[in-house]
Amino acid sequence: MSETAIQAVERKEKPKEVRSKGFVPGVIYGKGMDSISVKFDEKRLNKALQGRSQKAKISVQVAGETKQCFVGEIQKDITSGKTIHISMQVVEDDQVVKMKVPITFGGSEALSERKLIVLPYFSELELTGPSADIPEYVAVDVADKSLGDKITVADFMVSPSVSVLDDPEKIIAAITGAR
């Protein structure tokens, strides 16, 4: 989980009014709780999400209580790229969740030295397990791969408490020659 919690403030204002004051409107929801309409300071939210995956785990402090959340959906303005709304799902550490997480390929630099590249066919894997054990992303090292090698679901390692729901034989990427 993230080390510091981002502050959320309950809101009654309409989203447009919230945005005009430098905040991002959002909603926090979860199993067995009423949804809470909130607002986040735009700069602090962007800083908290910087370099994180779309489905990042983040601590949110609202009404004096810290909640562990997965980022559900981030809506962006198509012209400015600014975040205009965010939804966050509260989860307990032991709650079993099913979600898609992004894939990363480590060691691509070693491939490029040999004029090879990773050609990804898919960008995420579907996992299930306790929310505390779901990684922000799944990675595979491709540094030692050769031309024509395939990367399958089975090549990705996850915690023993987490299951990958995709077929282990599914080809995720291939190693090809750089153009």
Swiss-Prot record:
UniProt entry tagged with the keyword Nucleotide-binding: no
Top-level taxonomic group: Bacteria
A GO MF term: structural constituent of ribosome
GO cellular component, as recorded: cytosolic large ribosomal subunit
CDD domains: Ribosomal_L25_TL5_CTC
GO biological process, one term: translation
Alphabetical UniProt keywords: Ribonucleoprotein, Ribosomal protein, RNA-binding, rRNA-binding
UniProt xrefs under InterPro entries: Rbsml_bL25/Gln-tRNA_synth_N (IPR020056), Ribosomal_bL25/Gln-tRNA_synth (IPR011035), Ribosomal_bL25_b-dom (IPR020057), Ribosomal_bL25_C (IPR037121), Ribosomal_bL25_long (IPR001021), Ribosomal_L25_dom (IPR029751), Ribosomal_uL5_bac-type (IPR020930)
A Pfam family per the record: Ribosomal_L25p
Assembly mode: Part of the 50S ribosomal subunit; part of the 5S rRNA/L5/L18/L25 subcomplex. Contacts the 5S rRNA. Binds to the 5S rRNA independently of L5 and L18.
HAMAP family cross-referenced by the UniProt entry: Ribosomal_bL25_CTC (MF_01334)
Similarity comment: Belongs to the bacterial ribosomal protein bL25 family. CTC subfamily.
Job of this protein: This is one of the proteins that binds to the 5S RNA in the ribosome where it forms part of the central protuberance.
NCBIfam families: bL25_bact_ctc
Protein name, UniProt field: Large ribosomal subunit protein bL25
Organism: Desulfitobacterium hafniense (strain Y51)
